[in-house]
Curated annotation (Swiss-Prot):
Record-linked CDD domains: AdoMet_MTases
Lineage, broadest ranks: Bacteria, Bacillati, Bacillota, Bacilli, Bacillales
A molecular function (GO) term: rRNA (uridine-C5-)-methyltransferase activity
PANTHER family in UniProt: RNA M5U METHYLTRANSFERASE, TRNA (URACIL(54)-C(5))-METHYLTRANSFERASE
Keywords from the UniProt entry: 4Fe-4S, Iron, Iron-sulfur, Metal-binding, Methyltransferase, S-adenosyl-L-methionine, Transferase
Organism: Listeria innocua serovar 6a (strain ATCC BAA-680 / CLIP 11262)
Keyword Iron: yes
Name under which the protein is recorded: Uncharacterized RNA methyltransferase lin1863
Location of the active site: C410
EC assignment: 2.1.1.-
Highest taxon listed in the record's lineage: Bacteria
Enzyme class per UniProt: transferase
Length: 453
């Protein structure tokens, strides 16, 4: 059907055939696809068209005539408004199957790869998994509140709890909000640039139980700062209270200055027996239980004997590097963020791992230089951002020819693209293992190992 034969605000009946990568249902009217949030495959629904483009349109679900067996009642009271989760209406088994199918379909469509995609490694309990809460502060109905933004807006939802946040961190956000309100702290107003408090962040260390509270403010002076700190320490079991100062009129959460107001500068957590010092701004995986699962896949794929030189591109604070260093001859890590490299060096020292070298820079610039200087990896690990590996880095890998490339990915599309380049260059992959790091969302992590033929 031509889009011109359909009209905005028209109600249509259709059957949902599939889910898109962002979890929307897909149904067709005479071959013309409509994307409908919250609809599930197999459901017959009535939907109202909200937008029409030449080749596809969008609609809002009005009624479900035939309900999917995978549909569940979302337990979160603000799920329909909040932008934090997108799959609470799909059973957890259904979410795991959706993520596996996304990886398999992407491998075939983008990578032209016929690889095994086993079942997604999920969680026994897919709730309360996040060790970091980061919420904006604002006025809602004249009172100070802290919560996530409403979908596609910067309106804050007044929420009493978040079911994917660790309970200790969740309680800390609510207590902090109450204490700030008690002292009349003025929330930051994006439109005027006025106000004192921008965000509340909490970090919780799963293995030690340590808690950090971060107050992101517009200036160093915070009215009733001493009283706020006193109340926080009286009411919460807290290890560290930190202030970050961000005076800029921007959507970026953190400013350049961070100072410890009370307690320790860091909290400490462990992954696979490796200790990590985590500061307010450290990059650290947000799901500690699944991080162990993800890293175990990487460790198993590397098959280290103690004789190997390992290069870890995009190494962050050294979390994978240090787990591998226990079993490698030497590990070299590179990361563009200098603070992360400083953290990686400190974490290596904390664990008495002397067989590590960390350097600040772009992986695609530093690794070719290492290669020129005679550093050749037996195993090369990549854990790139969503955009995948830089082309120059892939060219260096193909020139260096490490026996194995262990690829940890947060984007199946760029993983498939990069795997295609590496397989055309002489590597072979047999399987891609999806890991569910972010239940109730559409985000997918996956691990594969490419072996030189």
């Amino acid at each position: 059907m031509e889009a011109s034969l359909l009209k905005k605000n028209q109600s249509v009946e259709l059957t949902i055939e599939d889910l898109t990568h962002d979890g929307s249902g897909v149904g067709k009217i005479d071959g013309y696809p409509l994307f409908i949030p919250n609809a599930l495959p197999g459901e017959k629904i009535t939907a109202k068209i909200t937008k029409l483009n030449k080749n596809y349109g969008f609609a809002r679900m009005e009624n479900i005539e035939v309900v999917s067996a995978e549909r569940v009642e979302p337990p979160c009271a603000v799920y329909s408004k909040c932008g934090g989760c997108s799959l609470q209406h799909l059973s957890y088994d259904g979410q795991l199957a959706f993520k596996r199918n996304q990886v398999e379909e992407t491998m075939k469509r983008i990578g032209k790869l016929n690889v095994e995609v086993p079942d997604t490694l999920g969680m026994e309990n897919p709730w309360r998994y996040r060790n970091k809460s980061q919420v904006p502060v604002g006025f809602v109905n004249g009172k100070l509140t802290a919560g996530f933004y409403q979908k596609r807006s910067h309106d804050i939802i007044d929420m009493s709890t978040c079911l994917i946040h660790n309970e200790k961190g969740d309680v800390a956000v609510q207590k902090t909000r109450e204490i700030l309100a008690k002292y009349g702290t003025e929330p930051y107003d994006e439109k005027t640039g006025k106000g004192d408090i921008r965000h509340i962040m909490t970090r919780f260390a799963h293995t030690t139980g340590q808690l950090m509270i971060v107050l992101v403010t517009t200036k160093e002076r915070l009215p009733f700062k001493a009283e706020i700190i006193q109340d926080l320490t009286n009411q919460l079991e807290v290890t560290s209270i930190v202030q970050n100062i961000n005076p800029q009129k921007t959507n970026v959460i953190f400013g350049d200055r961070t100072k410890t107001l009370w307690g320790s500068d860091i909290i400490e957590d462990t992954i696979h027996g490796i200790r990590f010092a985590i500061s307010a701004r450290s990059f650290y995986q947000v799901n500690p239980l699944q991080t162990e699962v993800l890293y175990q896949q990487a460790i198993d794929s590397a098959e280290l004997t103690g004789e190997e030189t390992v290069i870890d591109a995009y190494c962050g604070i050294g979390s994978i590097s240090l787990c591998l260093a226990k079993k490698a001859k030497h590990v070299y890590g590179v990361e563009i963020v200098d603070q992360a490299i400083q953290d990686a060096r400190a974490n290596a020292e904390l664990n008495n791992l002397t067989n590590t070298t960390f350097e600040t820079g772009k992986a695609e610039e530093v690794i070719p230089q290492w290669y020129k200087n005679g550093i050749v990896a037996d195993v090369l690990v990549v854990d790139p951002p969503r955009k995948g590996c830089d082309e120059t880095l892939l060219e260096t890998i193909l020139a260096m020819k490490p026996k194995k490339v262990v690829y940890v990915s947060c984007n199946p599309g760029t993983l498939a693209r990069d795997m295609k380049i590496l397989t055309e260059g002489g590597y072979e992959a047999k399987k891609v293992q999806p890991v569910d790091m972010f239940p109730m969302t559409t985000h997918i992590e996956a691990v594969t190992v490419l072996t030189l033929k």
